[in-house]
Amino acid sequence: MTRVLALDHGAARCGAAVSDPSGTLATPLTTIARPDSPAGLEAIADLVRETGAELVVVGLPLTLRGQEGEQAAAARAFAGRVAKAAGVRVELHDERLTTSHARRTGGSAGEDERAAARILESWLELRRVKR
């Protein structure tokens, strides 16, 4: 498996986390301000290069009923911009309850970074189950 970068998209901030090369661990990485801006997208492209990520997973904020709303549409559009800016494949992954989980877990990393790590953990876990 290769490194995977996960992003917890928000209008003001975007948390980022990266996997280890074996796809076992998700580590909170950083928070990017204004991720939809040209500077924010360039910062994400830089993270992709620096980490050697070959795939980016963007959290898809579905409702508790599993439906898409305005935030999900924004995440889909953001994923397209990330793919173009970073030149890598981008997947969307259900992020329901990741922010509340990040709030409960605490730690030295910021809440957005922890939410991105939770998205990545969930994505990695799903891949292990499918094997």
Feature-to-residue mapping (PLM):
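Phosphate- and other anionic-substrate recognition elements at nucleic-acid/protein interfaces
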Residues: 2-7, 11-131
